[in-house]
Amino acid sequence: MSEKFSPEFMAGVQLMSALMGMTLAFKKRFGDEAMKVAQGFTVQMGTMMGNKFKEKAGIKGSGIHDIERVYHVWLDPIIAPHKLKTNVEGNKLTVTRESPTVCPAIIVAKQMNLPLEMVCNNISMRMFEGIAKSVNPNAKHSSVQMSEHKCIEVIKIP
C-alpha cells in the first residue's frame, strides 16, 4: 500500500489509525463518553495543525478564502496528484472529494474493519473542524455526504 501513496498520505493514515485505535480502546474501557472526549481532542489537534499550516503559508486572515487556502496547504500534498476541489459562495466553503481520489480515512476504515462513518465522524471531520477553527474560531463544519466514492464537507463562518 505505501508504494501507491505519498509519504504525506501515509502519515495521515498513521495518525488517523493511532487516534481511532486509542478512541476505540477508551470506548471499550470507559463507554460512549470516551468518543466525545476523543472528538474534542481531535478538534484541538486540528486547530494546532491548522496554526502550523497558516504559518507555513503566511495566512493571517480569518475569512472563508483563508480557510480554503489552509485546506489546500493541508490536503493538496496528501491527495496528490489530485487537487482539493473547493467552491466558495459568500461565507460558505464546500470541499468535495470524488473517486478516484482517496483519503486516509477510507484506508483506516478498511484496515480496521470499521464503518467509514465511524472514522470520519470521530476523527477526520473533527480535524476538518479544528483546522477551520484555527483560521476562524466561529467556523461551523457539517458533512453533507460521506461515502467511499464521494464526500462533501461544508464550512460556514458568520
Regions found by a protein language model. Name each.
Residues M1-C120, N138-K150, I157-P158:
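N-terminal accessory segment detector
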Residues V119-F128:
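ATP phosphate-binding glycine-rich loop and adjacent ATP-lid/helix-beta elements
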